[in-house]
């Protein structure tokens, strides 16, 4: 019996990618239904270019022995998406929540970021067009990327981010920008809804020979569903490309984002039961805010001398100005009933400027049965400014001078070797070399805290992919994880002084299946992606809230922890006749995150992550562009402390989406939390919480949103 050749095997992977892209609402829609007066040549050429770009991303995914999800940015236009929590809703293994509906969100991938410093969102490396956005020390404190500025988002969970050079617990997320070559000449989006939300977005672009350019202006205002949670955001996103030759493309990206967001603060259980949407009193008196101005400039080039070789290179510079009142005055009456008035012992307003340089180099070569990818990421971050006393949102004297520096170099190589027909061996390694230099000077005493350390590790990976059918495959892999502490964690080391934390490290094993059914266009089509993983971690860095200075944290290394789980994404397109079909989609995650025979916490569950999280929808669609159906969320109970004494209740939500899509326009409406359930969205993590602990923030109540997009 003859066996398929390596070329046939690659074709099988591409077939899988194409079918998944055509059938999965998370990864792609089949395209706009043509209007009667549309130019068929223009429409076809546009779709061919977009699909070619998308299929390249999907083909890369098909050569990764682990959990990778591709989200099509076009799907964001059919529902209310204002932040990354909305955008990543259907990505299994990634748990995202917003405390007020604004940009400040909680995000965890495979159990990353489950502690009191969840505001820095470490454990996940963010990229934009392949260039690093996350700072050199690994934190994402100041901002997240705007998902509406992305053509696609690629989420590589855990060690599957090796092809991006990352080795951290949560993996990597890469947002790929649209260009004038894969977008309409002009688009206008208008949207709004509950809680005073008003959004507008205008995109214009053009192509002239070997030059192209695209500019987007974005505005979002919302009062928020809690008191003191208003957000005003203005953004400008632009890129220009030059096809210098048949082999060389160059592109420049520019971004400016100005976001001012009020923070409502957490509540006690009694306050939550009284009114879950009230603001914490100190959040109002302290005027808690997260105000960030961001400017970013990047250049990226692609050189493809032939079909078997491709070189990508790029540089980026980002400046972030942070103004962040976050702790109100903590007053202590030292003499009780005596004549002395209470004295302020602590308050906090952080005002810093953060500058990050980044660079990227990736070379892909196909050499016989080998598909080799080698790369380099470099980054350097300098944060300067101060920690001030907070007087109603105004600076009231400098407490600490901040001068933090970090740098990182990541080198990686991976070979996808077709060792036999239908079998691919994937092996490689990442090397990381990174430094931290934290300088915090107390103004009153002149004492300098100076934790400083260098970290290095070699992190190998080996896996295998077995093509089962032309449109399905199985995979397995074993990898090493490694993550150095952030500057936030070093400056909050529970030991104080100049002591430094150890880097987290461990090993993870993963197996899974992914694929799509292969049949006639009028048959039911299924697609699936499932992974099971187990990670044994040493020296995980966890932080608890500092009760002596609420709003700050204390960090330490934990001897052993376990991060294990099951991730599944399943969907279908079921014909009903008459041009109608049902498209169910289910994203399900099971988490088993715990301490491992810890001297203090034994085998307690890690906080913040639910045991299970299920999100999905059941859409009815027709060939004319109409769609409607329910959405649902089923989220299990979570612990709010390491001691497992404070349990946050599970919740279930029901929603509804409806819309209509045509060649030149589309409209949508969405109702969230249709039954108006009161539930906890995010919360602070303590060592041992009590009913009087102010840690709870409400999830979104019943809300209605609508949007209109016009294409010219």
Task: List where the protein language model places each region.
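Transmembrane beta-barrel wall of Gram-negative outer-membrane proteins
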Residues: 185-187, 192-221, 226-264, 288-310, ...
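Short acidic/polar hinge/loop motifs at secondary-structure boundaries
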Residues: 123-124, 131-157
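Face-selective signature of the C-terminal outer-membrane beta-barrel domain
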Residues: 246-255, 288-443, 477, 526-532, ...
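C-terminal beta-signal and adjacent terminal beta-strands/loops
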Residues: 482, 533, 634-641, 660-712
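Gram-negative outer-membrane beta-barrel transporters
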Residues: 420-421, 425, 433-434, 521, ...
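Extracytoplasmic beta-strand/coil segments of soluble accessory domains associated
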Residues: 60-61, 85-131
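Membrane-embedded beta-barrel scaffold of Gram-negative outer-membrane proteins
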Residues: 202, 211, 310-328, 467, ...
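Structural signature of Gram-negative outer-membrane beta-barrels, strongest in the C-terminal barrel
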Residues: 245, 367-379, 402-535, 592, ...
